[in-house]
Amino acid sequence: MSPLPLLISLLAGCGTDPVQEDVAAYHDAMTPLLAKNLVLAQGFLDVASKVKKGDTDAPQIAERLVSEITPAADQLRAEAEKIEPVTPKLGEAHALLVRAWGDRAASYHAMSDAWAQNDPAAFDLARKKNLQSKLDEETFFQTVNTIAQPYGLLIDQYP
């Protein structure tokens, strides 16, 4: 028996791993978005700390939420929606992130409205929705890094 068929089958199987390629492409696509996410989080934390300290009056907080924070959250969600992983598990994890970032953007809109209308109950409800979106985002990072880790990659939440 000729060793040629075995050699051909071995060479055919030596191609790159499609999951590894997808994870690497995903890592590269997500890194700039995660950098923007870090800037967004820092901006929101700045506003939140001012609210907590009472440093800023209601119109200024609402204006910053409306003019800076909320549009950045909307844009980030829209950019994330454009990324379409090929691997089903990676796609499912990414869908969780897109949903979390969408919920966060919606909570920022609701906080802006509640703050402008001086409605503490509505603000608290929006704040709780924001906290849940953060938990969902954490679940995403755990899930996606379980997928990426075998390939020596980390989807870094704080690049």
Residue ranges and their predicted role:
Residues 1-4:
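Bacterial N-terminal signal peptides that target proteins for export
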Residues 15-17:
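Bacterial signal peptide processing site
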Residues 22-101, 107-108, 114-115, 122-159:
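Alpha-helical segments in soluble extracytoplasmic regions
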Residues 10-13:
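C-terminal motif of bacterial Sec signal peptides marking the signal peptidase cleavage site
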